């Protein structure tokens, strides 16, 4: 049977990008995820020259706010992501013309998520106790994009002192060598290897191996012969207060709890 074309939902951080995709793309765009800088994982960099605050995190300003009214004029559905994990945020998104919200952080820490159960429990405990904080690290990711790191006071996680080895390579980028061949390099691989492939040594500073860390998050850390297992590195959106609000005095919660929490102000009880 003929395959059904999947919907193409583009992730954007500006109305200008959305309009360009909708009008000039050589294929159909079915909608947009509008991701703000409060979202977990990778973030779009701030518009303009990169500026850092006193903690070393990128500074976002008015230019980074998406013009949702202009986006709505395209007539395509859109979902708001980044700081949208609350009943109030869902209600506000719908009022602004959004089809809904995209939520990551609340589901990441629910019982059904793939994060290692012990790591998840420890993280929730620190979030509830107020010893966790989210840092937007402009250097951690080899992609060059800012990456949200959930810093935990009592949980050992990967840092940039890790002995470098690149044996998964999911974030490698292609480059053309002097001989015309295509090769692959990663700014988090051993520095001498990266430089030998024509990379700028400045690009290696502060990088972490997200590939190994994120696999370790799932409880499947690599352990090479004679070495300790790879350490995890959790990511989270900025809004830890909503996680605290949902978990309350419990030690965990389900995906169903998340859905009911998010829809509390918009769906009448059965």
Regions found by a protein language model. Give the residues of each.
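Glycine-rich beta-to-alpha transition loops that act as phosphate-gripper elements at the mouths
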Residues: 10-16, 76-89
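Generic hydrophobic/aromatic pocket-lining and core-packing "Φ" positions
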Residues: 18-22, 68, 90-91
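Conserved active-site-proximal phosphate/metal-binding subdomains
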Residues: 29, 37-77, 85, 95-270
